[in-house]
Amino acid sequence: MSLVERLQDSRRREGRPPQKAPRAARTSSAAPRPAVNRDLRTQLLRLDRIDSTLRSAWVATEFKDRALERKLNALTDAGIDWLRETIKVHGWPGHRLVGRSGAAAAWRLIQHADCSLAFQKHCLKLLRDAAARGDVPIQQVAYLTDVVRMREGKKQLYGTKFRKMKGELVPYPIEKEAGVDLRRKEMNLPSLAAYARKIRRTFQPS
């Protein structure tokens, strides 16, 4: 008789119910989610915060303050150099690596950058892959696609970029504009008309 059986037999003789064997600890088949890299996220949020402050001030001057423009360009250049090295080590900084706020900051940085077109196109590919696996919102792909196409001298696909003409903010030329709302819907974006109203409320208040 084993030790466990002897103990249970003793409990029965004493009028106590046999003790149940302890349950084995449950093991989860799902792999643990990797922790957010706090250092990378902190750096991205710092860059984003400074960029936002300078960019808002520059917009307020209607893009005429050259000193602010130079500061903004210097910050963006430094941020892109850092992002380039980060991508070499970690890949695109999506939600899993830097959280939602950090991933959004990385996306804004590459959108605003006047870096090499080749690097921006590389980032667009990484962003598409990240969106396909649910690591960034697909809307981010639409915005960066328009940036890259315009730098290539092409019309934008999604109508995310605007310019001022005759005192009004209007979209830059759009490829096959009749189908733009369908393309925007596929990227979880509102209609072009709704987006235009938001842009004008934000940057062209009455």
Model-predicted regions and their roles:
Residues Q8, Q19-K20:
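Charged/polar low-complexity intrinsically disordered segments
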Residues S2-R11, R183:
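Short linear clamp-binding motif
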Residues R6, A24-A25:
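Compositionally biased, low-complexity segments
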Residues A25-G153:
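N-terminal helix-rich structural modules
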Residues G94-L97, S191-R197:
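Short, surface-exposed acidic
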Residues L124-P190:
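An amphipathic alpha-helical core segment
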Residues L169, A196-S206:
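Intrinsically disordered, compositionally biased glycine-rich interaction modules
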